């Protein structure tokens, strides 16, 4: 782990000494468990102006919260989600589904809900309850389908700001996200510089590389070429382009894992005892990818996949400044924690260092941690003692600032 910063260091000693003791929040479950959570559907009647020039008139956002908002509303943390995640950040739903960042958020965890009020928002265009392609169009009553407008990271941030308004939160203690969520956190610091104290960007990038855009295009092509796609209006045909979604997920999943991790998990292990000279599954890694693809195709929406990957492609805050990221971040007022993982080749550490350099060029306070974890891009979702210690120590600093 390497620290590069313009403010007092979060050192290994800080991380080791960060308070890990928390009282049990609810009797009858582990002290660090949030327990059962119930999401809330927020409706917004006021039209949301989109970057593409159109509007969404009347929309819903699914929201989930953890912890207690303090009297001056200074302890709120917004968690922004990645491609296939949702508002369900932590805790457990009634059907048993555990939040996607439950190891990070909760009582006594790095983002301690005994001290912080944490908000998860499902983005517009997603398929987990917020208004998206599966939702009925207000004029026709039929699903939006392909008529749902193309949305961007900036549109999501504007919608999230309305959620903050609904809670009466003028300034977040922190906005945090991993991968695509990290792009949203960065966008928050640029679009609403007075509305967050800290910006936490994990396993992310200030813009996609040509290679990443290419991966997204191949994945979208798999969906668009599926005969069951029907131009995006497959709902009316009572079908789903599962074959395309399956391939798209398989492509994506390869980019989330490191070569080292895949070698350790699968190597060249065969599915059966010997090769069968067929085009069916022969290797364990093939079986794994097919399983992941099949599972994803059952619960995710194809139109949503197209929208979110395109939002990834479009994100480039430096574009309006002649390609200069240094100029793009000049006006931000937040302090930053930027974390990358050495084996992440989807959003390589070089991209995080690019952001760190731009921030330091402007003398903005930034702490940088580069973690030597073997799990590739997915490392941001997994437990790693060094990674979690760094995040814990940073949030300890935030808690001291706001008196949480």
Curated annotation (Swiss-Prot):
Site description Important for acyl-CoA specificity, residues in chain: 346
Low complexity compositional bias, start-end: 1-25
Active site, per annotation: 179 (nucleophile), 344, 377
Keywords associated with the record: Acyltransferase, Amino-acid biosynthesis, Cytoplasm, Methionine biosynthesis, Transferase
Single annotated GO MF: homoserine O-succinyltransferase activity
Enzyme Commission designation: 2.3.1.46
EC top class named in words: transferase
Residues annotated for substrate binding in this entry: 249, 378
Assigned GO CC terms: cytoplasm
Catalysed reactions listed for this entry: L-homoserine + succinyl-CoA = O-succinyl-L-homoserine + CoA
Intracellular or extracellular location(s): Cytoplasm
Pathway: Amino-acid biosynthesis; L-methionine biosynthesis via de novo pathway; O-succinyl-L-homoserine from L-homoserine: step 1/1
Coarse class of the protein's main subcellular location: cytoplasm
Pfam families named in the record: Abhydrolase_1
Matching Gene3D superfamilies: 1.10.1740.110, alpha/beta hydrolase
Domain AB hydrolase-1: 75-384
N-terminal signal peptide: none
BP GO annotations: homoserine metabolic process; methionine biosynthetic process
Residues covered by region (Disordered): 1-30
Subunit structure: Homodimer.
Function: Transfers a succinyl group from succinyl-CoA to L-homoserine, forming succinyl-L-homoserine.
Entry similarity comment: Belongs to the AB hydrolase superfamily. MetX family.
Protein name: Homoserine O-succinyltransferase
Species this chain originates from: Ralstonia pickettii (strain 12J)
Gene designation: metXS
């Amino acid at each position: 782990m390497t620290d590069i910063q313009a403010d007092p260091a979060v050192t290994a000693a800080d991380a080791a000494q960060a308070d890990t003791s928390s009282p049990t929040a609810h009797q009858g479950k582990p002290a660090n468990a949030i327990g059962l959570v119930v999401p809330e559907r927020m409706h917004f009647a006021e039209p949301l102006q989109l970057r593409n020039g159109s509007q969404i008139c009347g929309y819903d956002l699914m929201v989930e919260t953890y912890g207690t908002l303090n009297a001056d509303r200074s302890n709120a943390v917004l968690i922004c989600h990645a491609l296939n995640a949702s508002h369900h950040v932590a805790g457990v739903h009634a059907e048993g589904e555990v939040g996607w960042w439950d190891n990070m958020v909760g009582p006594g965890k790095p983002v301690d809900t005994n001290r912080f009020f944490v908000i998860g928002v499902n983005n517009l265009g997603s398929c987990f309850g917020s208004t998206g392609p599966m939702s009925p169009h207000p004029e026709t009553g039929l699903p939006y389908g392909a008529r749902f407008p193309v949305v961007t990271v900036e549109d999501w941030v504007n919608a999230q700001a309305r959620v903050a308004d609904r809670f009466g939160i003028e300034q977040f203690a922190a906005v945090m996200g991993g991968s695509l969520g990290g792009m949203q956190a960065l966008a928050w610091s640029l679009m609403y510089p007075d509305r967050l104290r800290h910006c936490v960007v994990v396993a992310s990038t200030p813009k996609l590389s040509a290679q990443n855009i290419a991966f997204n295009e191949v994945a979208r092509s798999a969906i668009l070429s599926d005969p069951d796609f029907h131009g995006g209006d497959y709902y009316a045909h009572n079908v789903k382009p599962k074959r395309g979604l399956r391939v798209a997920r398989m492509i994506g999943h390869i980019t989330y894992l490191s070569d080292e991790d895949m070698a350790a998990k699968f190597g060249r292990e065969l599915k059966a005892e010997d090769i069968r000279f067929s085009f069916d599954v022969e290797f364990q890694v093939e079986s794994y990818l097919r399983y992941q693809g099949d599972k994803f195709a059952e619960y995710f929406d194809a139109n949503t996949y197209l929208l979110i990957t395109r939002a990834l492609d479009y994100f480039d805050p430096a574009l309006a400044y002649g390609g200069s990221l240094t100029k793009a971040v000049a006006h931000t007022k937040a302090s930053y924690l930027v974390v990358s993982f050495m084996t992440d080749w989807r959003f390589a550490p070089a991209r995080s260092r690019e952001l760190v350099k731009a921030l330091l060029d402007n003398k903005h306070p930034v702490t940088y941690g580069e973690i030597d974890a073997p799990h590739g891009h997915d490392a941001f979702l997994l437990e790693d003692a060094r990674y979690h210690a760094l995040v814990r120590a940073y949030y300890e600093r935030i808690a001291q600032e706001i008196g949480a």
